[in-house]
Structure formats: structure tokens, C-alpha cells
Amino acid sequence: MYKKDSIDGRQKRGIYILPNLFTSASLFCGFYAVVASFQGRFLSAAIAILISFIFDGMDGRVARLTGTTSKFGVEYDSLADLVAFGVAPAILAFTWGLSGFGRLGWLAAFLYVATTALRLARFNVLSHSGVSSKSYFLGLPCPAAAAMVATTVLMAQHLGIVGPVRHFSVLIMIYVLSFLMVSSVRYPSFKDSKWLQRRPFTSMVGFILAFMILAIQPKVTLFWVSAIYVATGPVLLTIRLFSPIKSKVSTTTRSPKAVVSNREDQKDEH
């Protein structure tokens, strides 16, 4: 009896450790990316950040599937995210394209780290208070911003982009990503699986096509996927801002015949 209880206890502790192992793997990849950046192995650093992105997406799902979510795991995940998606991309961007700007370059890298920390703090506060939404993120998620930095390095090396074009592009990108992370721009979270459940066949075909495209041109595909997601927030915001104006214009520019017919319909209803 005692032996059985001890075995069950070890199993429970093992399941509890399992999601934190994925978090630790994400943290390790982020730290490795920092080391690789200082050694000038920028391609390895970018790949490490993308692998960290995968591990970060798995730890929460494993915790929910095994029923081992905890406050410790949430806090540990946030600290790991700060290293993997804050410090590591900032160091990569600085050593790869910002070091030539001097003070302006390292200030941009620091701004990226600071806004990542602020983004994570706000996310934790909203999650604990229960006011966060499952359908969207408030501000650009820091893993998506880190993926944008990493895939930019991959894309630039794929195209052979060097010189001032690369340096100024990285500088502008870091400032834009920093702003988007602490902004109130909404980004889709893709946590709602109702659409996948309603159209399983279409979803399966889409995943197969995406995998084929990724296998053919992984660097190009990952870059455009990251860039499209980063642009999704401002595009959706623009649509929401102009949609009321468009509806007002459509109601005020109706033809006189439509107005007369509408009035006649209202009379008939009375």
C-alpha cells in the first residue's frame, strides 16, 4: 500500500514537472540564442529563438491537458519568455544590425527588452483579473515579435542583404515591434477552435498546404507568416475605424427612391 502511494506521488510530481520542462527548454533555447549572437552565429541564434517559440507554445497546452496548471508555472513561463523573446531577440538584433548605430542601437535594443517586460506584466495582470479575451491579444504577443526578428535574420541571409539597408531596416523594425507590443492593438489569438471543428476537412487541407509550402521554402515562408501576423493588428484596427464611417456614408447617400419606399413600408407596418 505504501509502495503504491509512493509510486502515485512520483507520477503526480512527474506530470507537474512535465510542462515546466518545456518551459526550461524554451529558456535554454533563448539563452543559447544570446550566446550564439555574441559568437557571430546569427543563423543559429535565429533558429534557437524559433525553437523556443515552439516549446513556449507546448508548455501551456501540456499543462492544461495534464491538469497541472499552477501559479508557479505561470510565473516561470513569464520569466522564461522575457529571456527567450525579450533579451535574446534584442541581443540578436543588436549584434546583427544595430551595433553600428552606437548609442542609438543599444538604446533600441533596451527599448525592445523593456517593452517585452511591460507586455508580459500587462498580460499577467489581465489574466489574473479575468478581463482578458480568448479571441484576441491586447498588443503584439512577444513570441510573435521575437519570431519577426528571427525570421528577418533568416530572410536577409537567404537574400544576401547586407549594408545600410539591413541596418536601417532592423532599427525601424525594432522600434515598430516595441510600440506594437505595448499598444492596445488587438491581435487574433487563434485559441477558439470552433472554426476548426466546424470545418475539419478544410482545416486539414489548409494545414497540409501550409506544411508543403514550409517544406519548399522554410525561410521565406516563416518570414511572410510572421510579417503578415504583425501587420494583422494594424490592418484590423484600420478596418474597425473606417467601418462605422462607411456605414454612415451608405445610409446618408441612399437614393430618394429608396427613402420613399422605406417610408411607404413604415406606413404599411403601422
Question: At which residue positions do the language-model features occur?
Answer:
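Active-site His/Glu-centered metal-binding helix of metallohydrolases
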Residues: 28, 54, 58, 62, ...
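Multi-pass membrane catalytic core of lipid/isoprenoid biosynthesis enzymes
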Residues: 14-23, 65-123, 152-154
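Helix-coil boundary and interhelical linker segments in multi-pass alpha-helical membrane proteins
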Residues: 32-47, 83, 87-109, 151-169, ...
